[in-house]
Amino acid sequence: MSDLVLYEVAVGEGVLALTSMPGRTGSFAKDLSDIIAWRPSFVVTLVEQSELDDKSAGKIGVAFAQVGINWAHLPTIDFGTPLIEDNPAWDDMIISAVRYLSDGARVLVHCYGGCGRSGMAALRIMIAAGEAAEPALSRLRVIRPCAIETSAQMLWAQKL
């Protein structure tokens, strides 16, 4: 068992979880194994490629594909929000995440620490799934108090 913690919240008929980057504090292989055992249908990676490479996690997408887990890589700078030109990819990810959750599946979102970028994406997904912003944020912060670290992330998450 790794030290990776999955912070889960029910959304729709499914489960949405936030976590830190696999391999951040321990073995990438062990963390990956724990994620696979959790059985997500969809994983969203928000770290930049250099962050993955620094922790020997550069082939994470290949690892997920090998076991049939759908994966989206939306690199976003630490403490940042998506760039305008990245919005179509984010829109596609949110639509996919909501679809998986409404079908009763599990969706995992991770950044480096599992707080700011992950919280921003999770809140946006929860709102897109039909939740009101404030109750969704409250539920999210019950499981992950550090979810969303900047006012820019909060504004971006709440805009649809």
PLM segments and residue spans:
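Short beta-strand-to-coil "C-cap" segments at the C-terminal boundary of structured domains/repeats
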Residues: Q158-L160
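Short beta-strand/loop segment at the start of cytosolic alpha/beta domains
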Residues: M1-V11
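Cysteine-based protein phosphatase catalytic domain of the PTP/DSP
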Residues: E13-R106, A129-W156
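A phosphate-binding catalytic loop at a beta-strand-loop-alpha-helix junction
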Residues: L101-L123, I127
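Homeobox/homeodomain signature
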Residues: L6-E8, G61, A105, G116
